[in-house]
From Swiss-Prot:
The gene is lytN. SUPFAM superfamilies: Cysteine proteinases, LysM domain. GO terms for molecular function: hydrolase activity; lytic endotransglycosylase activity. It is found in: Secreted. This is Probable cell wall hydrolase LytN. Residues 241-378 form the Peptidase C51 domain. It holds the Pfam family LysM. GO terms for cellular component: extracellular region. PROSITE patterns: CHAP, LYSM. GO terms for biological process: cell wall organization. InterPro entries: CHAP_dom (IPR007921), LysM_dom (IPR018392), LysM_dom_sf (IPR036779), Papain-like_cys_pep_sf (IPR038765), YSIRK_signal_dom (IPR005877). It comes from Staphylococcus aureus (strain N315).
Amino acid sequence: MFIYYCKECSIMNKQQSKVRYSIRKVSIGILSISIGMFLALGMSNKAYADEIDKSKDFTRGYEQNVFAKSELNANKNTTKDKIKNEGAVKTSDTSLKLDNKSAISNGNEINQDIKISNTPKNSSQGNNLVINNNEPTKEIKIANLEAQNSNQKKTNKVTNNYFGYYSFREAPKTQIYTVKKGDTLSAIALKYKTTVSNIQNTNNIANPNLIFIGQKLKVPMTPLVEPKPKTVSSNNKSNSNSSTLNYLKTLENRGWDFDGSYGWQCFDLVNVYWNHLYGHGLKGYGAKDIPYANNFNSEAKIYHNTPTFKAEPGDLVVFSGRFGGGYGHTAIVLNGDYDGKLMKFQSLDQNWNNGGWRKAEVAHKVVHNYENDMIFIRPFKKA
């Protein structure tokens, strides 16, 4: 009986141990699952927080970039004005490109100071510089921006016009003269408006009396003097007009019949005058045909009447077909500005009053108005 009790107790103890072991395994499992879930939840929260922080950083950077661009655009004109008028550039938090041409707007601003980056980024090969105020800066002269063109600036000038900047080469101050037979330094100096000592110093000549044929000398440039156009002096012009008027006086108050037909016609008076100048009369069925029926290339020049035209003594005046019953009229000018206003002229006429065919109207003076359709013929010769 005692033994049976002990076996039963032993069996119960084993069963209780198994139950406790199972409970422990379940507890450990639940605890492991809980810890795992906790760790997983923490990592997920951390990843989500990191994503939020990164998103905030990206948004903040985007906002800063947009703000910087808007601030750059807002200050764009102000910056240009400062570059042009003050010669100094004050940049914002972002990079700014400076055009060298806009920085040097005129000669007065070349020696002004400008602050630029000590190590500019993304600098182009042209005249543009990138200025960044996040890096150390130093002051330099704008003139240093053109250091690459220093050799060219010795011979070229920069000029500003409406279309921008352009350069032109300065005219040389000296030219080469080759010594010829019979030349002397004094004669050369006189020719080029300089002194003997100046030529000596320029060409390192010790003895001014010793130069050689074919020797090359530097002499000053002299401007080209264009010959003045030949003009007829007022005295010569007045003399020629006087001789013409004197001849025309001999024709006045007389009747002239050059071709022996129809009495004393206007055409007859003009033919007498032209025959005196060139030895022949003029062609034409009527007076209005004179400018077109004759070749005046070597004898005269033809003028059409204009508001500023002034006839000269000795000119032939040809009236259109509105006069003379359709045949026109012609006369010889005595005074091209009879009224002082270029509205009237005086001429020597024949048959103006239709009395020539009866030989009742001699050559006489008549004052006419300038008409739009008048033609004037000016002979090269003077009577």
